[in-house]
C-alpha cells in the first residue's frame, strides 16, 4: 500500500526497491 511505499522512500530506499518491497 501507499503507507508502505512512503515509509520505504523515507527510509532512503529508491523507487524500484520500494515498488518490490511494497507490491
UniProtKB/Swiss-Prot annotation:
Disulfide bonds join 4-22, 8-18. GO terms for molecular function: potassium channel regulator activity; toxin activity. The keyword Secreted applies. The record marks 19 as: Basic residue of the functional dyad. One of its GO terms (cellular component) is extracellular region. Keywords: Disulfide bond, Ion channel impairing toxin, Potassium channel impairing toxin, Secreted, Toxin, Voltage-gated potassium channel impairing toxin. The record marks 5 as: Aromatic residue of the functional dyad. Expressed by the venom gland. Coiled coil: none annotated. Has the structural arrangement of two alpha-helices stabilized by disulfide bonds (CSalpha/alpha 2(S-S)). Shows very weak blocking activity on voltage-gated potassium channels Kv10.1/KCNH1/EAG1 (6.2% inhibition by 40 uM of the toxin). Has no effect on the other voltage-gated potassium channels tested. Negative results: has no effect on Kv1.1/KCNA1, Kv1.2/KCNA2 and Kv1.3/KCNA3 potassium channels, suggesting that the presence of an additional charged residue in a position adjacent to the dyad lysine impedes the functional block of Kv1 channels produced by this toxin. This is Potassium channel toxin kappa-KTx 1.3. It comes from Heterometrus spinifer.
Amino acid at each position: 500500500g501507499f503507507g508502505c511505499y512512503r515509509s520505504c522512500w523515507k527510509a532512503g530506499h529508491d523507487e524500484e526497491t520500494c515498488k518490490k518491497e511494497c507490491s
